[in-house]
C-alpha cells in the first residue's frame, strides 16, 4: 500500500494548548482512519509543521485523511496550510 505524508503548517495555538500537544493530536486524528507509519515536527521556511506519514490505498483516500486531520486539528491550533505527498520510489510527489 502506498505511503503518504500530510504536512500541516501550524499557526497560533488554541488557548490552554501546549506546543507539544499538536503532533500527537495530528497523529491521533490520522490514526482514526488509517495506519500511521511515522510522525515528526519540521520547520519549513520558518513555519512549524506537524508531519504525519501514513498508508492509504489511493490519492483520494489520502486527501480525505489529510482533510480529517486538518479539520480536527483546528480544535488545537490554527492550520495555515495542508500539503499531501505520496512516496514514489525515493521521491515524495505532491498530491494536494
Pin down the residues of each PLM region:
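Long, contiguous binding/interaction regions
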Residues: 1-96
